[in-house]
């Protein structure tokens, strides 16, 4: 049963997810997935065998709107390296589609442990201002395609837009913080779109999904969350471009660490 409390909570989370997406070039999935699961619980359907798939698919659908809003705002700031986006997008879409098809077969716990470890390492390197070698640049197309496929698949399995992976990678390749975040927003939109299509198709014929679902997309939550994210993503972008690069980089490292702590807490509780 939908109540004003649920709707207002979704709007609040959508606002926060949109702002964070714009600020850090991510998709906001780390906030959206838990709140969708909470919404399903209030509807009495959290025990559905595909509840997690519904949450991830819904997260991707919301990110389609969030990341487009963020990407457009970053483009107006001339902060996106479109050549890098064009080179990485095909492999990332391929990885997302692989992830969507194989999600139900993945050892979720092992994947989450690996992801938590990776985020913690990257966060600590970012916070300690570990600088890459000046000679380090993006790899050639074969290497970039391998990275893109891996990032796309991981994004699909965990339900994120990929910014938690692509921003550190781009900064590791000597992209300035603002440029890395802007370019990541350009990469996040095709990931979100591919993930949405993947979860829509793979869940289309699954029986007994909640009323209002389209495949593994819970459409009422998509509509409410997207309204807020579209509004607040450009605000996050404007805020990011007002911050010094060092402060933005530290803030991003703190965000990664908080995501890792949250995921670890969910594993052990």
Identify the meaning behind each predicted range.
Residues 160:
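Conserved, well-structured core segments that form the ligand-binding/active-site neighborhood
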Residues 182-200:
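Hydrophobic alpha-helical transmembrane segments of multi-pass integral membrane proteins
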Residues 165:
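Transmembrane-embedded, aromatic-rich helix segments that form part
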């Amino acid at each position: 049963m939908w109540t004003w409390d649920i709707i207002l909570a979704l709007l609040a989370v959508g606002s926060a997810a949109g702002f964070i997406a714009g600020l850090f070039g991510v998709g906001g999935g780390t906030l959206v997935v838990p709140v969708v699961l909470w919404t399903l619980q209030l509807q009495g359907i959290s025990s559905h065998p595909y509840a997690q798939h519904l949450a991830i698919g819904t997260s991707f659908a919301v990110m389609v709107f969030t990341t487009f809003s963020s990407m457009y705002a970053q483009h107006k700031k001339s902060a996106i390296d479109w050549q890098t986006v064009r080179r990485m997008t095909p492999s990332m879409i391929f990885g997302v589609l692989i992830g969507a098809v194989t999600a139900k077969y993945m050892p979720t716990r092992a994947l989450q442990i690996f992801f938590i470890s990776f985020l913690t390492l990257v966060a600590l390197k970012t916070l300690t201002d570990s600088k890459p070698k000046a000679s380090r640049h993006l790899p050639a197309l074969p290497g970039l395609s391998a990275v893109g496929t891996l990032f796309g698949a991981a994004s699909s399995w965990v339900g994120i837009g990929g910014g938690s992976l692509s921003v550190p990678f781009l900064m590791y390749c000597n992209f300035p913080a603002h440029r890395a975040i802007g370019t990541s927003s350009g990469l996040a939109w095709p990931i979100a779109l591919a993930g949405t299509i993947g979860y829509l198709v793979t869940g289309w014929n699954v029986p007994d999904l909640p009323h209002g679902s389209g495949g593994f997309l819970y459409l009422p939550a998509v509509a409410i969350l997207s309204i807020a994210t579209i509004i607040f993503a450009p605000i996050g972008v404007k805020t990011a471009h007002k911050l010094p690069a060092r402060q933005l980089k530290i803030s991003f490292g703190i965000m990664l660490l908080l995501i890792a702590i949250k995921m670890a807490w969910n594993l052990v509780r």
